[in-house]
Design a protein with these regions (language model features):
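Loop-rich catalytic cores of soluble enzymes, especially ATP-dependent carboxylate-amine ligases
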Residues: 138, 142-151, 155-260
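Terminal catalytic/cofactor-binding subdomain
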Residues: 1-149, 157, 246, 260-278
Length: 278
């Protein structure tokens, strides 16, 4: 701990205020999938901005209980650090809807990309020859401004599947996080399809990727200050983390086209979180 008791309390509350929880979404899910953009001859191309401009012109539709619902593509498809990558995101949903949302986004993404001569490729690791263009987002441009080329290459060459599980409040989130952290190495093995190459490359970008257990939110706050993410919790890049959106995020899984495989990861993470609830 640092400073007097009043300073510690203020410091802790400032840190905790970054995390917003909504009890109605407890044990709800969200899945993020990263992919590379390639042309018909499998050439990796930095065309994320062009692709997003095209995708965001139209809404996608979803059939639900006999009705056709509109899906906002701006919420479902976004950019990554690499201009060769896109990220898709499901809306918050319950476990039984996961596979349907993944298929809905997959079908629509492939169709939209095909209209501009692009394809989604779900490699865990791209070749060393991958273009290193950074998406023109101020945050990513700032992050990469002084980044060594080796680190930039590593950051651009790997993609993953990230899974969020909603939590009702701060204390429950910390309890579930600690339980999940114990399972991290097992989940890393389950989510690897590159014989450890993606994990090795990720270690070049962020060597400190293993989640740490915390005795309390003050313990978490102290570590955040020491590790440099206290003022922006998005900068915590460990494989399991509590997010500002009030979720436990599992970040160790690689990219894959196989939706059934992703759903198996989601079910396992759901069980880990549910079993840890008080």
């Amino acid at each position: 701990m640092h400073g007097n008791i009043a300073d510690q309390a203020e410091r802790l509350e400032k840190f905790k205020s970054q995390f917003v929880f909504d009890p109605q979404y407890s044990l709800w899910h969200g899945v993020e999938r990263e992919c590379f953009l390639v042309t018909g001859d499998d050439t990796y191309v930095p065309r994320a901005r062009e692709a997003l401009t095209h995708i965001h012109r139209n809404a996608w539709s979803r059939k639900h209980r006999g009705r056709t619902l509109s899906v906002d593509t701006r919420k479902c498809v976004g950019f990554e650090l690499s201009a060769v990558q896109l990220e898709t995101r499901t809306p918050p949903h319950q476990l039984h809807d996961t596979a349907d949302y993944l298929r809905l986004i997959d079908i629509n993404l492939r169709s939209s990309l095909g209209e501009v001569g692009l394809y989604a490729r779900y490699d865990e690791v791209a070749p060393k020859s991958l273009p290193l263009d950074v998406y023109p987002d101020p945050r990513y441009l700032r992050i990469t401004a002084s980044m060594p080329r080796e680190v930039l290459s590593a950051a651009c060459r790997i993609t993953g599947t990230h899974h969020h599980v909603g939590m009702p409040d701060h204390e429950t989130a910390l309890r579930v996080y600690n339980a999940a952290a114990k399972e991290c190495r097992k989940l890393m093995q389950l989510g690897d399809n590159s014989h450890g190459e993606r994990l090795r490359i990720y270690g070049i970008v962020k060597p400190d990727y293993m989640p740490r257990p915390y005795d309390s939110w003050m313990d978490f706050c102290d570590d955040a200050h020491e590790s440099g993410f206290a003022d922006d919790v998005r900068s915590n890049w460990r494989f399991i983390r509590i997010t500002r959106y009030g979720t436990i995020e599992f970040r160790m899984f690689g990219s894959t086209e196989n939706i059934d495989r992703i759903y198996s990861w989601v079910r396992l993470c759901h069980a880990i979180c549910k079993d840890a609830l008080p």
